Amino acid sequence: MTENPITKYIGNFIDELSLAGVTEAVICPGSRSTPLAILAASHPDINVHIHVDERSAAFFAMGMAKAMRKPVALICTSGTAAANFYPAVIEAHYSRIPLMILTADRPHELREVGAPQAIDQQFLFGNFVKFFTDSALPDSHPDMLAYIRSLAARAAGEAKKAPRGPVHINFPLREPLMPNLEDEPFQRLRSGSHVTVESGRFRADRHELVALSALIKETEKGVIVCGELQDDDAKEHIVALSQAAEYPILADPLSNLRNGTHSKETIIDAYDSLLKEEQLKRELMPELVIRFGAMPVSKPLFQLLKQNPSIRQIVVDPDGGWRDPTQLSAHMLHCTEEEIAVLADSAVNSENRTGNWLEKWRFANSRFRALLRNLEAEDLTFEGNIYRNLQHLIPDNSSVFVGNSMPIRDADTFFENQERTFRIFANRGANGIDGVVSTALGIYAATKEPVTLVIGDLSFYHDLNGLLVSKTLDIPLTVVLVNNDGGGIFSFLPQSAEERYFELLFGTPTGLEFEHAAKLYGGRYICPESSAHFADAYLSSVNRRGLDIIEVKTKRDDRVEQHRRMLDSALHEIRKEWPF
Protein backbone atom coordinates (compact mmCIF):
# COMPACT_ATOMS: atom_id res chain seq x y z
CA MET A 1 0.00 0.00 0.00
CA THR A 2 1.31 3.45 -0.92
CA GLU A 3 2.13 5.59 2.10
CA ASN A 4 -0.15 8.61 2.55
CA PRO A 5 2.17 11.59 3.19
CA ILE A 6 -0.59 13.31 5.18
CA THR A 7 0.06 11.03 8.17
CA LYS A 8 3.63 11.99 8.95
CA TYR A 9 3.35 15.55 7.64
CA ILE A 10 0.37 16.57 9.78
CA GLY A 11 1.51 14.26 12.59
CA ASN A 12 4.86 16.03 12.81
CA PHE A 13 3.10 19.39 12.82
CA ILE A 14 0.73 18.42 15.66
CA ASP A 15 3.57 16.88 17.67
CA GLU A 16 5.69 20.01 17.36
CA LEU A 17 2.75 22.11 18.53
CA SER A 18 2.60 20.01 21.69
CA LEU A 19 6.32 20.49 22.24
CA ALA A 20 5.76 24.25 21.88
CA GLY A 21 3.28 24.15 24.77
CA VAL A 22 -0.05 23.71 22.97
CA THR A 23 -2.07 21.27 25.08
CA GLU A 24 -5.63 22.12 24.01
CA ALA A 25 -7.34 21.93 20.62
CA VAL A 26 -10.90 22.98 19.77
CA ILE A 27 -12.17 21.05 16.76
CA CYS A 28 -15.13 21.83 14.51
CA PRO A 29 -16.28 18.74 12.57
CA GLY A 30 -15.65 18.63 8.83
CA SER A 31 -14.27 16.39 6.10
CA ARG A 32 -11.33 18.33 4.67
CA SER A 33 -9.91 18.85 8.18
CA THR A 34 -9.94 15.09 8.90
CA PRO A 35 -6.15 14.66 9.26
CA LEU A 36 -5.82 17.68 11.53
CA ALA A 37 -8.71 16.53 13.71
CA ILE A 38 -7.76 12.85 13.96
CA LEU A 39 -4.10 13.46 14.63
CA ALA A 40 -4.83 16.13 17.25
CA ALA A 41 -7.31 13.78 18.93
CA SER A 42 -4.84 10.88 18.90
CA HIS A 43 -1.89 12.84 20.27
CA PRO A 44 -1.24 11.79 23.89
CA ASP A 45 -0.42 15.31 25.11
CA ILE A 46 -3.31 17.22 23.51
CA ASN A 47 -6.83 17.47 24.90
CA VAL A 48 -9.55 18.00 22.31
CA HIS A 49 -12.86 19.83 22.68
CA ILE A 50 -15.47 19.27 19.96
CA HIS A 51 -17.75 22.18 19.04
CA VAL A 52 -20.17 22.03 16.11
CA ASP A 53 -20.69 25.81 15.71
CA GLU A 54 -17.60 27.56 14.36
CA ARG A 55 -18.40 31.04 15.65
CA SER A 56 -19.02 29.77 19.17
CA ALA A 57 -16.05 27.39 18.93
CA ALA A 58 -13.67 30.25 18.18
CA PHE A 59 -14.81 32.21 21.22
CA PHE A 60 -14.63 29.04 23.31
CA ALA A 61 -11.00 28.53 22.25
CA MET A 62 -10.30 32.19 22.94
CA GLY A 63 -11.75 31.85 26.45
CA MET A 64 -9.41 28.95 27.13
CA ALA A 65 -6.40 30.87 25.82
CA LYS A 66 -7.45 33.97 27.78
CA ALA A 67 -7.50 32.05 31.06
CA MET A 68 -4.39 29.95 30.37
CA ARG A 69 -2.37 32.73 28.73
CA LYS A 70 -0.98 30.28 26.21
CA PRO A 71 -1.97 29.26 22.67
CA VAL A 72 -4.97 27.04 21.98
CA ALA A 73 -5.37 25.36 18.59
CA LEU A 74 -8.59 25.94 16.63
CA ILE A 75 -9.32 23.57 13.74
CA CYS A 76 -11.96 23.71 11.00
CA THR A 77 -12.71 22.50 7.49
CA SER A 78 -12.59 24.52 4.26
CA GLY A 79 -15.12 27.06 3.00
CA THR A 80 -17.13 29.48 5.11
CA ALA A 81 -16.34 27.54 8.30
CA ALA A 82 -13.23 29.64 8.88
CA ALA A 83 -15.10 32.87 8.14
CA ASN A 84 -17.18 32.19 11.25
CA PHE A 85 -13.99 32.45 13.30
CA TYR A 86 -13.60 36.10 12.31
CA PRO A 87 -15.29 37.88 15.27
CA ALA A 88 -13.24 35.89 17.79
CA VAL A 89 -10.04 36.47 15.82
CA ILE A 90 -10.67 40.22 15.96
CA GLU A 91 -11.30 40.06 19.71
CA ALA A 92 -8.17 37.94 20.23
CA HIS A 93 -6.12 40.46 18.24
CA TYR A 94 -7.20 43.46 20.28
CA SER A 95 -7.15 41.57 23.60
CA ARG A 96 -3.70 40.09 22.88
CA ILE A 97 -4.83 36.47 23.22
CA PRO A 98 -2.72 33.71 21.60
CA LEU A 99 -4.70 31.51 19.18
CA MET A 100 -3.47 28.93 16.66
CA ILE A 101 -5.98 28.95 13.78
CA LEU A 102 -5.55 25.83 11.64
CA THR A 103 -7.80 25.79 8.57
CA ALA A 104 -8.07 22.97 6.06
CA ASP A 105 -8.32 23.96 2.39
CA ARG A 106 -8.71 22.48 -1.06
CA PRO A 107 -5.42 21.84 -2.87
CA HIS A 108 -4.25 24.51 -5.30
CA GLU A 109 -5.70 22.83 -8.40
CA LEU A 110 -9.22 23.10 -6.91
CA ARG A 111 -9.03 26.80 -6.06
CA GLU A 112 -10.86 29.42 -8.11
CA VAL A 113 -12.28 26.80 -10.50
CA GLY A 114 -15.76 26.39 -9.05
CA ALA A 115 -14.95 23.39 -6.84
CA PRO A 116 -17.43 22.87 -3.98
CA GLN A 117 -16.70 24.29 -0.52
CA ALA A 118 -13.66 26.14 -1.84
CA ILE A 119 -13.22 29.83 -1.09
CA ASP A 120 -10.15 32.06 -1.12
CA GLN A 121 -8.66 31.46 2.33
CA GLN A 122 -5.41 33.33 1.70
CA PHE A 123 -4.94 36.09 4.29
CA LEU A 124 -8.54 35.48 5.32
CA PHE A 125 -8.11 37.34 8.61
CA GLY A 126 -6.09 40.23 7.20
CA ASN A 127 -4.13 42.27 9.72
CA PHE A 128 -5.91 40.66 12.66
CA VAL A 129 -3.41 37.80 12.75
CA LYS A 130 0.28 38.22 13.58
CA PHE A 131 1.39 35.56 11.13
CA PHE A 132 -0.13 33.77 8.13
CA THR A 133 1.15 31.13 5.79
CA ASP A 134 -0.30 28.75 3.25
CA SER A 135 1.53 25.54 4.05
CA ALA A 136 3.12 23.35 1.41
CA LEU A 137 1.19 20.27 0.32
CA PRO A 138 1.80 17.23 2.56
CA ASP A 139 5.04 15.44 1.79
CA SER A 140 6.86 12.82 3.87
CA HIS A 141 10.36 13.70 2.63
CA PRO A 142 12.64 14.40 5.65
CA ASP A 143 13.22 17.97 4.47
CA MET A 144 9.46 18.58 4.41
CA LEU A 145 8.99 17.07 7.87
CA ALA A 146 11.69 19.43 9.14
CA TYR A 147 9.88 22.28 7.36
CA ILE A 148 6.49 21.53 8.91
CA ARG A 149 7.99 21.17 12.40
CA SER A 150 9.77 24.49 12.01
CA LEU A 151 6.51 26.05 10.86
CA ALA A 152 4.66 24.77 13.94
CA ALA A 153 7.34 26.10 16.29
CA ARG A 154 7.48 29.44 14.51
CA ALA A 155 3.71 29.93 14.55
CA ALA A 156 3.41 29.01 18.23
CA GLY A 157 6.30 31.33 19.02
CA GLU A 158 4.64 34.19 17.14
CA ALA A 159 1.38 33.64 19.05
CA LYS A 160 3.22 33.80 22.39
CA LYS A 161 5.58 36.65 21.51
CA ALA A 162 4.68 40.09 22.85
CA PRO A 163 2.15 41.28 22.11
CA ARG A 164 0.40 37.91 22.12
CA GLY A 165 -2.18 37.28 19.45
CA PRO A 166 -3.70 34.93 16.86
CA VAL A 167 -1.81 33.26 14.00
CA HIS A 168 -3.24 31.43 10.98
CA ILE A 169 -1.91 28.44 9.06
CA ASN A 170 -3.88 27.26 6.03
CA PHE A 171 -3.41 23.62 4.99
CA PRO A 172 -4.15 22.60 1.37
CA LEU A 173 -5.00 18.89 1.59
CA ARG A 174 -5.56 16.33 -1.16
CA GLU A 175 -7.58 13.16 -0.81
CA PRO A 176 -7.21 10.57 0.61
CA LEU A 177 -7.64 12.46 3.86
CA MET A 178 -7.56 9.59 6.37
CA PRO A 179 -4.21 9.29 8.16
CA ASN A 180 -2.77 5.88 8.99
CA LEU A 181 -2.31 5.81 12.76
CA GLU A 182 -0.21 2.65 12.48
CA ASP A 183 2.43 4.66 10.62
CA GLU A 184 4.06 6.35 13.67
CA PRO A 185 2.67 9.82 12.89
CA PHE A 186 4.48 11.52 15.80
CA GLN A 187 7.94 10.11 15.23
CA ARG A 188 10.46 12.87 15.96
CA LEU A 189 13.38 13.91 13.84
CA ARG A 190 15.45 14.56 16.98
CA SER A 191 14.96 14.29 20.73
CA GLY A 192 12.98 17.18 22.19
CA SER A 193 11.71 20.16 20.23
CA HIS A 194 12.80 20.52 16.63
CA VAL A 195 13.38 24.19 17.36
CA THR A 196 12.78 26.13 20.57
CA VAL A 197 11.48 29.68 20.24
CA GLU A 198 12.27 32.00 23.15
CA SER A 199 11.05 35.58 23.30
CA GLY A 200 11.50 38.14 26.04
CA ARG A 201 9.68 41.36 26.87
CA PHE A 202 10.68 44.95 26.28
CA ARG A 203 12.97 46.71 28.73
CA ALA A 204 13.19 50.45 29.30
CA ASP A 205 16.29 52.55 29.00
CA ARG A 206 17.78 53.20 32.43
CA HIS A 207 17.77 56.96 31.82
CA GLU A 208 14.00 56.87 31.18
CA LEU A 209 13.41 55.11 34.50
CA VAL A 210 15.59 57.57 36.40
CA ALA A 211 13.68 60.46 34.81
CA LEU A 212 10.36 58.89 35.79
CA SER A 213 11.59 58.43 39.36
CA ALA A 214 12.48 62.11 39.53
CA LEU A 215 9.09 63.07 38.12
CA ILE A 216 7.29 61.00 40.76
CA LYS A 217 9.38 62.58 43.51
CA GLU A 218 8.47 66.11 42.48
CA THR A 219 4.78 65.44 41.74
CA GLU A 220 2.43 64.90 44.67
CA LYS A 221 -0.82 64.87 42.71
CA GLY A 222 -0.32 61.68 40.77
CA VAL A 223 -2.59 58.72 40.12
CA ILE A 224 -2.02 55.24 38.78
CA VAL A 225 -4.65 54.06 36.30
CA CYS A 226 -4.90 50.31 35.88
CA GLY A 227 -6.93 48.45 33.27
CA GLU A 228 -6.90 44.78 32.30
CA LEU A 229 -3.41 43.33 32.80
CA GLN A 230 -1.67 40.63 30.77
CA ASP A 231 -0.13 38.92 33.81
CA ASP A 232 -1.27 38.57 37.43
CA ASP A 233 2.28 39.11 38.72
CA ALA A 234 2.04 42.75 37.65
CA LYS A 235 -0.43 43.53 40.44
CA GLU A 236 2.06 43.33 43.30
CA HIS A 237 4.49 45.64 41.52
CA ILE A 238 1.80 48.22 40.80
CA VAL A 239 0.60 48.15 44.41
CA ALA A 240 4.18 48.58 45.65
CA LEU A 241 4.70 51.64 43.46
CA SER A 242 1.38 53.09 44.59
CA GLN A 243 2.19 52.73 48.28
CA ALA A 244 5.68 54.16 47.92
CA ALA A 245 4.61 57.13 45.79
CA GLU A 246 1.41 57.67 47.80
CA TYR A 247 -0.58 57.62 44.59
CA PRO A 248 -4.12 56.20 44.46
CA ILE A 249 -4.76 53.37 41.99
CA LEU A 250 -7.89 53.91 39.89
CA ALA A 251 -8.57 50.21 39.38
CA ASP A 252 -10.81 48.99 36.59
CA PRO A 253 -12.65 45.79 37.63
CA LEU A 254 -10.74 43.85 34.95
CA SER A 255 -7.42 44.76 36.58
CA ASN A 256 -8.47 42.35 39.36
CA LEU A 257 -6.91 44.76 41.83
CA ARG A 258 -10.24 45.22 43.61
CA ASN A 259 -10.28 41.55 44.61
CA GLY A 260 -7.52 39.42 46.12
CA THR A 261 -5.45 39.27 49.28
CA HIS A 262 -3.11 42.19 48.47
CA SER A 263 -3.37 45.52 50.26
CA LYS A 264 -6.31 47.73 49.18
CA GLU A 265 -5.17 50.84 51.06
CA THR A 266 -4.51 52.84 47.91
CA ILE A 267 -7.04 51.22 45.58
CA ILE A 268 -9.94 53.40 44.48
CA ASP A 269 -12.93 51.44 43.18
CA ALA A 270 -15.49 54.26 42.81
CA TYR A 271 -13.54 56.68 40.62
CA ASP A 272 -15.96 56.32 37.69
CA SER A 273 -18.80 57.68 39.82
CA LEU A 274 -16.70 60.29 41.64
CA LEU A 275 -15.48 61.83 38.38
CA LYS A 276 -19.07 62.49 37.28
CA GLU A 277 -19.37 65.27 39.87
CA GLU A 278 -17.75 68.56 38.81
CA GLN A 279 -16.69 69.79 42.25
CA LEU A 280 -15.12 66.47 43.16
CA LYS A 281 -13.45 66.29 39.78
CA ARG A 282 -11.76 69.63 40.43
CA GLU A 283 -10.63 68.50 43.89
CA LEU A 284 -9.27 65.22 42.54
CA MET A 285 -7.64 66.57 39.37
CA PRO A 286 -4.21 64.90 38.96
CA GLU A 287 -1.06 66.43 37.52
CA LEU A 288 0.53 63.09 36.62
CA VAL A 289 -1.05 59.83 35.43
CA ILE A 290 0.83 56.53 35.11
CA ARG A 291 -1.21 54.00 33.13
CA PHE A 292 -0.85 50.22 33.20
CA GLY A 293 -2.81 47.72 31.13
CA ALA A 294 -5.65 48.30 28.71
CA MET A 295 -7.75 51.46 28.77
CA PRO A 296 -10.37 51.17 31.54
CA VAL A 297 -14.10 50.97 30.88
CA SER A 298 -14.82 54.32 32.56
CA LYS A 299 -15.95 57.10 30.22
CA PRO A 300 -15.61 59.87 32.86
CA LEU A 301 -11.95 58.89 33.32
CA PHE A 302 -11.33 58.98 29.58
CA GLN A 303 -13.01 62.40 29.34
CA LEU A 304 -10.89 63.71 32.22
CA LEU A 305 -7.69 62.67 30.45
CA LYS A 306 -8.86 63.85 27.04
CA GLN A 307 -10.15 67.24 28.15
CA ASN A 308 -7.16 68.17 30.30
CA PRO A 309 -4.00 68.11 28.17
CA SER A 310 -2.01 69.64 31.04
CA ILE A 311 -2.14 66.27 32.82
CA ARG A 312 1.12 64.51 32.12
CA GLN A 313 0.36 60.96 31.01
CA ILE A 314 2.81 58.05 31.01
CA VAL A 315 1.70 54.77 29.44
CA VAL A 316 3.56 51.62 30.49
CA ASP A 317 3.17 48.71 28.07
CA PRO A 318 5.44 45.67 28.48
CA ASP A 319 4.26 44.35 25.12
CA GLY A 320 5.40 47.34 23.10
CA GLY A 321 1.94 48.40 21.95
CA TRP A 322 0.34 51.83 21.57
CA ARG A 323 -2.61 52.15 23.93
CA ASP A 324 -3.35 55.85 23.95
CA PRO A 325 -6.83 56.77 22.67
CA THR A 326 -6.43 60.24 24.20
CA GLN A 327 -3.48 61.02 21.87
CA LEU A 328 -2.04 63.07 24.74
CA SER A 329 0.49 60.78 26.42
CA ALA A 330 3.86 62.37 27.07
CA HIS A 331 5.78 59.09 27.40
CA MET A 332 5.28 55.54 26.11
CA LEU A 333 7.38 53.21 28.25
CA HIS A 334 7.83 49.74 26.79
CA CYS A 335 8.98 47.87 29.88
CA THR A 336 7.65 45.51 32.53
CA GLU A 337 5.67 46.56 35.58
CA GLU A 338 8.47 45.11 37.68
CA GLU A 339 10.96 47.57 36.21
CA ILE A 340 8.69 50.43 37.21
CA ALA A 341 8.32 48.93 40.69
CA VAL A 342 12.07 49.19 41.31
CA LEU A 343 11.42 52.92 41.42
CA ALA A 344 9.27 52.40 44.51
CA ASP A 345 12.09 52.58 47.06
CA SER A 346 13.35 55.87 45.69
CA ALA A 347 10.05 57.41 44.57
CA VAL A 348 8.94 59.04 47.80
CA ASN A 349 10.11 62.44 48.87
CA SER A 350 8.22 62.84 52.11
CA GLU A 351 9.12 66.53 52.39
CA ASN A 352 7.02 67.23 49.30
CA ARG A 353 4.02 65.14 50.40
CA THR A 354 1.33 66.80 52.51
CA GLY A 355 -0.72 63.63 52.83
CA ASN A 356 -3.89 65.36 51.67
CA TRP A 357 -3.79 64.09 48.10
CA LEU A 358 -4.20 60.40 48.79
CA GLU A 359 -6.50 61.10 51.73
CA LYS A 360 -8.88 63.07 49.50
CA TRP A 361 -9.29 60.09 47.20
CA ARG A 362 -9.66 57.63 50.06
CA PHE A 363 -12.24 59.79 51.83
CA ALA A 364 -14.38 60.22 48.70
CA ASN A 365 -14.12 56.53 47.86
CA SER A 366 -14.97 55.21 51.34
CA ARG A 367 -17.89 57.61 51.78
CA PHE A 368 -19.33 56.73 48.38
CA ARG A 369 -19.21 53.02 49.20
CA ALA A 370 -20.69 53.54 52.66
CA LEU A 371 -23.55 55.61 51.26
CA LEU A 372 -24.30 52.98 48.62
CA ARG A 373 -24.34 50.22 51.24
CA ASN A 374 -27.02 52.12 53.15
CA LEU A 375 -29.35 52.15 50.16
CA GLU A 376 -32.07 49.52 49.84
CA ALA A 377 -30.68 46.45 48.05
CA GLU A 378 -33.82 44.31 47.97
CA ASP A 379 -35.44 45.62 44.77
CA LEU A 380 -33.98 43.49 41.97
CA THR A 381 -35.77 45.50 39.29
CA PHE A 382 -32.94 48.01 39.81
CA GLU A 383 -30.01 46.38 38.06
CA GLY A 384 -27.42 47.84 40.41
CA ASN A 385 -28.80 45.70 43.22
CA ILE A 386 -28.04 42.53 41.26
CA TYR A 387 -24.33 43.37 41.37
CA ARG A 388 -24.42 44.56 44.97
CA ASN A 389 -25.90 41.22 46.04
CA LEU A 390 -23.81 39.08 43.72
CA GLN A 391 -20.35 40.35 44.71
CA HIS A 392 -20.69 38.93 48.23
CA LEU A 393 -21.79 35.50 46.99
CA ILE A 394 -19.09 34.72 44.41
CA PRO A 395 -16.95 31.78 45.61
CA ASP A 396 -13.21 32.13 46.09
CA ASN A 397 -10.94 30.77 43.34
CA SER A 398 -13.75 31.06 40.80
CA SER A 399 -14.14 33.24 37.71
CA VAL A 400 -16.71 35.89 36.83
CA PHE A 401 -17.24 36.69 33.18
CA VAL A 402 -19.01 39.99 32.62
CA GLY A 403 -20.81 40.83 29.38
CA ASN A 404 -20.33 44.06 27.48
CA SER A 405 -22.69 47.00 27.21
CA MET A 406 -24.32 47.58 30.65
CA PRO A 407 -23.02 44.58 32.68
CA ILE A 408 -19.36 45.65 32.60
CA ARG A 409 -20.32 49.24 33.43
CA ASP A 410 -22.54 48.17 36.32
CA ALA A 411 -19.74 45.94 37.59
CA ASP A 412 -17.48 49.00 37.48
CA THR A 413 -19.98 51.00 39.51
CA PHE A 414 -21.04 48.41 42.07
CA PHE A 415 -18.17 45.91 42.52
CA GLU A 416 -16.07 47.19 45.42
CA ASN A 417 -12.78 46.22 47.03
CA GLN A 418 -12.83 42.91 48.88
CA GLU A 419 -10.46 40.17 50.01
CA ARG A 420 -12.07 37.50 47.83
CA THR A 421 -9.84 35.65 45.36
CA PHE A 422 -12.07 35.35 42.29
CA ARG A 423 -10.96 36.65 38.87
CA ILE A 424 -13.02 38.91 36.61
CA PHE A 425 -12.92 38.56 32.82
CA ALA A 426 -14.58 40.31 29.88
CA ASN A 427 -14.09 40.66 26.13
CA ARG A 428 -12.91 44.27 26.01
CA GLY A 429 -10.69 44.07 22.95
CA ALA A 430 -13.39 45.01 20.45
CA ASN A 431 -16.15 45.34 23.10
CA GLY A 432 -18.62 43.24 21.12
CA ILE A 433 -21.69 41.56 22.58
CA ASP A 434 -21.19 38.38 20.52
CA GLY A 435 -19.51 35.18 21.70
CA VAL A 436 -19.73 36.03 25.39
CA VAL A 437 -21.40 32.76 26.46
CA SER A 438 -18.80 30.69 24.63
CA THR A 439 -15.87 32.66 26.02
CA ALA A 440 -17.15 32.07 29.56
CA LEU A 441 -17.49 28.34 28.88
CA GLY A 442 -13.91 28.34 27.59
CA ILE A 443 -12.76 29.92 30.85
CA TYR A 444 -14.16 26.93 32.75
CA ALA A 445 -12.62 24.44 30.31
CA ALA A 446 -9.23 25.98 31.11
CA THR A 447 -9.56 26.50 34.88
CA LYS A 448 -11.95 23.73 36.00
CA GLU A 449 -13.24 26.16 38.64
CA PRO A 450 -16.78 27.61 38.91
CA VAL A 451 -17.68 30.30 36.38
CA THR A 452 -20.39 32.92 36.79
CA LEU A 453 -21.55 34.66 33.62
CA VAL A 454 -23.28 38.02 34.07
CA ILE A 455 -24.88 38.97 30.78
CA GLY A 456 -27.63 41.07 29.21
CA ASP A 457 -30.52 39.60 27.23
CA LEU A 458 -29.38 40.72 23.76
CA SER A 459 -25.85 39.45 24.28
CA PHE A 460 -27.22 36.15 25.62
CA TYR A 461 -29.45 35.79 22.56
CA HIS A 462 -26.44 36.40 20.29
CA ASP A 463 -24.63 33.31 21.56
CA LEU A 464 -27.30 30.86 22.68
CA ASN A 465 -25.67 28.27 20.40
CA GLY A 466 -22.67 28.33 22.68
CA LEU A 467 -24.67 26.67 25.47
CA LEU A 468 -24.55 23.35 23.65
CA VAL A 469 -21.05 22.53 24.94
CA SER A 470 -22.29 22.92 28.50
CA LYS A 471 -24.29 19.80 27.72
CA THR A 472 -21.96 17.91 25.36
CA LEU A 473 -18.73 18.62 27.26
CA ASP A 474 -20.33 18.60 30.73
CA ILE A 475 -19.29 22.16 31.57
CA PRO A 476 -21.09 23.74 34.54
CA LEU A 477 -22.09 27.38 34.14
CA THR A 478 -24.09 29.80 36.25
CA VAL A 479 -25.72 32.43 34.06
CA VAL A 480 -27.02 35.57 35.77
CA LEU A 481 -29.20 36.93 32.99
CA VAL A 482 -30.07 40.61 33.40
CA ASN A 483 -33.10 40.95 31.16
CA ASN A 484 -34.32 44.48 30.49
CA ASP A 485 -35.79 43.32 27.17
CA GLY A 486 -33.55 45.23 24.81
CA GLY A 487 -30.54 47.48 24.54
CA GLY A 488 -30.42 49.03 27.98
CA ILE A 489 -27.27 51.05 27.39
CA PHE A 490 -28.98 53.21 24.78
CA SER A 491 -31.26 54.62 27.48
CA PHE A 492 -28.17 56.43 28.83
CA LEU A 493 -27.22 57.88 25.44
CA PRO A 494 -28.55 60.88 23.46
CA GLN A 495 -30.50 58.52 21.19
CA SER A 496 -33.03 58.06 24.00
CA ALA A 497 -34.32 61.61 23.43
CA GLU A 498 -35.78 60.65 20.04
CA GLU A 499 -38.90 58.87 21.26
CA ARG A 500 -40.36 58.24 17.79
CA TYR A 501 -37.54 55.93 16.76
CA PHE A 502 -35.93 54.88 20.02
CA GLU A 503 -37.67 51.55 20.58
CA LEU A 504 -37.58 50.63 16.88
CA LEU A 505 -33.91 51.37 16.26
CA PHE A 506 -32.21 51.18 19.66
CA GLY A 507 -34.44 49.69 22.36
CA THR A 508 -35.13 46.64 20.14
CA PRO A 509 -37.18 44.56 22.59
CA THR A 510 -37.32 40.85 21.70
CA GLY A 511 -39.87 39.54 24.20
CA LEU A 512 -38.00 36.21 24.39
CA GLU A 513 -38.81 33.65 27.08
CA PHE A 514 -35.41 32.33 28.09
CA GLU A 515 -36.85 29.49 30.12
CA HIS A 516 -37.13 27.65 26.80
CA ALA A 517 -33.37 28.03 26.25
CA ALA A 518 -32.71 26.25 29.53
CA LYS A 519 -34.91 23.37 28.44
CA LEU A 520 -33.33 23.22 24.98
CA TYR A 521 -29.83 22.82 26.40
CA GLY A 522 -30.68 20.65 29.40
CA GLY A 523 -30.30 23.35 32.03
CA ARG A 524 -32.24 24.58 35.04
CA TYR A 525 -34.12 27.90 35.07
CA ILE A 526 -35.24 30.18 37.85
CA CYS A 527 -36.53 33.75 37.99
CA PRO A 528 -35.98 35.08 41.55
CA GLU A 529 -38.21 37.83 42.88
CA SER A 530 -36.20 38.90 45.92
CA SER A 531 -32.59 39.25 47.01
CA ALA A 532 -32.92 36.27 49.34
CA HIS A 533 -34.39 34.15 46.56
CA PHE A 534 -31.59 35.28 44.24
CA ALA A 535 -28.92 34.36 46.80
CA ASP A 536 -30.41 30.90 47.35
CA ALA A 537 -30.62 30.24 43.62
CA TYR A 538 -27.08 31.44 43.00
CA LEU A 539 -25.44 29.50 45.84
CA SER A 540 -27.28 26.33 44.81
CA SER A 541 -26.04 26.77 41.25
CA VAL A 542 -22.34 27.34 41.92
CA ASN A 543 -22.20 24.28 44.17
CA ARG A 544 -23.47 21.77 41.61
CA ARG A 545 -22.84 20.54 38.09
CA GLY A 546 -24.82 21.60 35.05
CA LEU A 547 -26.24 24.73 33.47
CA ASP A 548 -28.27 27.19 35.54
CA ILE A 549 -29.97 30.26 34.09
CA ILE A 550 -30.95 32.75 36.79
CA GLU A 551 -33.00 35.37 34.99
CA VAL A 552 -33.59 38.70 36.71
CA LYS A 553 -36.21 40.76 34.90
CA THR A 554 -35.62 44.48 35.24
CA LYS A 555 -37.33 47.64 34.03
CA ARG A 556 -35.45 49.44 31.31
CA ASP A 557 -37.71 52.51 31.52
CA ASP A 558 -36.90 53.11 35.19
CA ARG A 559 -33.21 52.25 35.37
CA VAL A 560 -31.77 55.54 34.09
CA GLU A 561 -33.69 57.61 36.62
CA GLN A 562 -32.94 55.16 39.45
CA HIS A 563 -29.26 55.13 38.58
CA ARG A 564 -28.95 58.90 38.42
CA ARG A 565 -30.96 59.41 41.60
CA MET A 566 -28.71 57.00 43.48
CA LEU A 567 -25.51 58.65 42.23
CA ASP A 568 -26.77 62.18 42.81
CA SER A 569 -27.76 61.34 46.38
CA ALA A 570 -24.39 59.81 47.24
CA LEU A 571 -22.32 62.51 45.53
CA HIS A 572 -24.39 65.27 47.17
CA GLU A 573 -23.63 63.84 50.61
CA ILE A 574 -19.91 63.64 49.85
CA ARG A 575 -19.88 67.31 48.80
CA LYS A 576 -21.63 68.27 52.05
CA GLU A 577 -19.16 66.28 54.16
CA TRP A 578 -16.02 67.29 52.26
CA PRO A 579 -13.44 68.17 54.97
CA PHE A 580 -10.50 69.36 52.89
From Swiss-Prot:
The keyword Magnesium applies. CDD domains: TPP_PYR_MenD, TPP_SHCHC_synthase. It is an enzyme of class 2 (transferase). Keywords: Magnesium, Manganese, Menaquinone biosynthesis, Metal-binding, Thiamine pyrophosphate, Transferase. It comes from Bacillus licheniformis (strain ATCC 14580 / DSM 13 / JCM 2505 / CCUG 7422 / NBRC 12200 / NCIMB 9375 / NCTC 10341 / NRRL NRS-1264 / Gibson 46). This is 2-succinyl-5-enolpyruvyl-6-hydroxy-3-cyclohexene-1-carboxylate synthase. One of its GO terms (biological process) is menaquinone biosynthetic process. Its cofactor is Mg(2+); Mn(2+); thiamine diphosphate. GO terms for molecular function: 2-succinyl-5-enolpyruvyl-6-hydroxy-3-cyclohexene-1-carboxylic-acid synthase activity; magnesium ion binding; manganese ion binding; thiamine pyrophosphate binding. Pathway: Quinol/quinone metabolism; 1,4-dihydroxy-2-naphthoate biosynthesis; 1,4-dihydroxy-2-naphthoate from chorismate: step 2/7; Quinol/quinone metabolism; menaquinone biosynthesis.
